[in-house]
Swiss-Prot record:
It comes from Shigella flexneri. Its EC number is 4.2.99.20. PANTHER family: 2-SUCCINYL-5-ENOLPYRUVYL-6-HYDROXY-3-CYCLOHEXENE-1-CARBOXYLATE SYNTHASE (PTHR42916), PROTEIN PHYLLO, CHLOROPLASTIC (PTHR42916:SF1). GO terms for molecular function: 2-succinyl-6-hydroxy-2,4-cyclohexadiene-1-carboxylate synthase activity. This is 2-succinyl-6-hydroxy-2,4-cyclohexadiene-1-carboxylate synthase. The lineage of its organism: Bacteria, Pseudomonadati, Pseudomonadota, Gammaproteobacteria, Enterobacterales. Monomer.
Length: 252
């Protein structure tokens, strides 16, 4: 079994760009940015519980990283960058810290490196369980209307929120709930020490209006790119800014 993905081929001799979407996204999420890099082969992945991978069950991060490895092998991807947003960024950091053959580097947009104490984890577990129950039992339009009122999305205007609610409501609530619980920050280890001791290139992107993740970025041993005129979902709010940062990173 492998993850559903869309592959687009570029020039030989360049590494692949493997894109991982955020919670409730899918393989289309990164394509506006990724298609600016047509010289590179691109793989747009559907994570477990999402899109074409919605039917794949998940028990924890080990399932996610194992299937990601198998998916890369199935596409014969030998050299690659992982590019992940939010949940996809956390998956990228987890997989990279566990070890991935052929990994050139990791580019994370708004991904959390992990909570640092038991109290924070317990609070996050309570919160994620409540959200998961809502995703399982309530209309997704109602759940996402509240989801996008969370402080991390404060930079969105009403039109942007309505657009995201309509888009995300096409998901399967039960499989979203399973993925939310399986990959909760409550069960993710704190990756700061591993990232400091890494052997791969590591870059971090965050929107200039995303104060929470700008503060987190300052804690990491990463080259940070601040995306102007953007909040938490920088590649959606300012795709040109993210394209410019990726182009700068990939030139090195």
């Amino acid at each position: 079994m492998i993850l559903h993905a869309q592959a687009k081929h570029g020039k030989l001799g360049l590494p692949w760009l493997v894109f991982l979407h955020g919670f409730s996204g899918d393989c289309h999420e990164w394509q506006e940015v990724g298609e600016a890099f047509a010289d590179y082969s691109r793989l747009y992945v559907d994570l477990l519980g999402h899109g074409g991978s919605a039917a794949i069950s998940v028990d924890g991060f080990d399932d996610v990283t194992d299937l990601l490895r198998k998916t890369l092998v199935s596409y014969n991807i030998l050299d690659f960058w992982l590019v992940g947003y939010s949940l996809g960024g956390r998956v990228a950091m987890m997989a990279a810290c566990q070890g991935l053959a052929g990994l050139c580097g990791v580019i994370v947009e708004g991904g959390h490196p992990g909570l640092q104490n038991a109290e924070q984890r317990a609070e996050r577990q309570r919160s994620d369980r409540q959200w998961a129950q809502r995703f399982r039992t309530e209309p997704l339009t109602a759940v996402f209307a509240d989801w996008y009122q969370q402080p991390v999305f404060a930079s969105l205007n009403d039109d942007q929120r309505r657009e995201l609610v309509a888009l995300r409501s096409n998901n399967n609530g039960a499989t979203l709930a399973a993925m939310l619980e399986a990959t909760s920050l409550a069960v993710q280890p704190d990756l700061r020490a591993n990232l400091s001791a890494r052997t791969f290139a590591f870059y971090y992107l965050c929107g200039e209006r995303d104060s929470k993740f700008r503060a987190l970025a300052a804690e990491l041993a990463a080259d940070c790119h601040v995306i102007p005129r953007a909040g938490h979902n920088a590649h959606r709010e300012n795709p040109a800014g993210v394209i410019a940062s990726l182009a700068q990173i990939l030139r090195f």
